[in-house]
Design a protein with these regions (language model features):
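Generic hydrophobic transmembrane alpha-helix motif, especially the helices
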Residues: 102-137, 144-145
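Short cytoplasmic-facing helical segments at TM-TM junctions of multi-pass membrane proteins
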Residues: 141-180, 212
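Transmembrane alpha-helical segments of polytopic membrane transport and secretion proteins
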Residues: 1-20, 240-256
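C-terminal transmembrane helix and the adjacent membrane-cytosol boundary/short C-terminal tail
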Residues: 91, 178, 182, 226-256
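Periplasmic/extracellular loop-to-transmembrane helix junction in inner-membrane transport proteins
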Residues: 4-7, 32-74
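Transmembrane-helix boundary motif in ABC transporter permease subunits
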Residues: 71-101
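Transmembrane alpha-helices
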Residues: 128-132, 165-197, 238
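Non-cytoplasmic
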Residues: 130, 183-233, 243
């Protein structure tokens, strides 16, 4: 006998039930606190979110912050991939890069942001912090992917003098694809969290960080939650776009 619901329908139902459960927990906490300015209810946050979505200035704010953070992601990804390639080829580069990567992973975002805001304009703070936080993720993933590649295939390509571009397209990149996708997905989320945190510290004009800080000091808790929802949505959309673009690039390369 065939099941009434397919596996996909059951998974969707579980997601909806999980979301409803946590919304109920949220509502219960809001009712327990009993003060909207301390802990806003889901309906209050939804009202604030709809108000923000009807404001053209909110879209400009979101695009400005997302653009700067994604620029930092791209710079960090490029630097991490290049450094990983060099580290896999030259032991000296690997040993020189190891302390840099360890520091970028261990030092708190606040410390980086406070130091950076002294040295650079607050307008570029989220870009710089996103780059610093994002590059170790891509570095580690790509380096691990290179180390896990088939050495015999690489040696055979060298023996038969396969051109570098052909080796890159047919051998190296297809193997690195899952490592890159995983790294991109993780790095985008980290870049948004760290980038917005840097904006809250540097307070560049017209950014999400500035709006969050304004909501905090004025106890506009519903707006604080609403902007947090927007940050999460921006992160999800940007990660989805990066992964789709990555898949498209690899599918095009496979046809070369």
């Amino acid at each position: 006998m065939k099941p009434i619901f397919s596996a996909e329908q059951r998974r969707a139902a579980y997601r909806i039930l999980a979301a409803l459960f946590w919304f109920a927990v949220w509502q219960a906490l809001a009712m327990a606190v009993g003060q909207e300015f301390l802990f806003a209810s889901p309906l209050k946050v939804l009202h604030s979110l709809l108000r923000l979505l009807s404001d053209p200035a909110a879209y400009l704010t979101a695009l400005l912050s997302a653009g700067r953070i994604m620029l930092g992601f791209l710079l960090g990804a490029a630097f991490g991939i290049l450094l990983a390639a060099l580290s896999s080829r030259f032991a000296l580069v690997f040993h020189l890069a190891s302390p840099l990567v360890a520091m970028a992973r261990a030092v708190p975002v606040a410390s980086f942001a406070i130091l950076a805001v002294i040295l650079v304009s607050s307008r570029f703070l989220s870009t710089l912090i996103a780059m610093v936080i994002g590059f170790p993720v891509l570095y580690a993933n790509v380096l691990e992917g290179i180390r896990q590649s088939d050495r015999k295939l690489r040696e055979m390509a060298a023996v038969f003098q396969v051109p570098f571009f052909r080796r890159l397209v047919s051998l190296h990149l297809p193997h690195l694809a899952p490592y890159l996708r995983t790294g991109f997905a993780a790095a985008v989320g980290l870049c948004f969290k760290s980038g917005v945190a840097a904006e809250v510290i540097g307070l560049p004009r017209g950014t999400i960080g500035e709006r969050l800080y304004f909501a905090k000091v004025n106890f506009f808790t519903a707006d604080l939650f609403a902007w947090t929802v927007i940050i999460v949505l921006l992160s999800i959309v940007c990660a989805w776009g990066v992964l789709k673009l990555t898949d498209l690039c690899f599918s095009r390369l496979a046809k070369i």
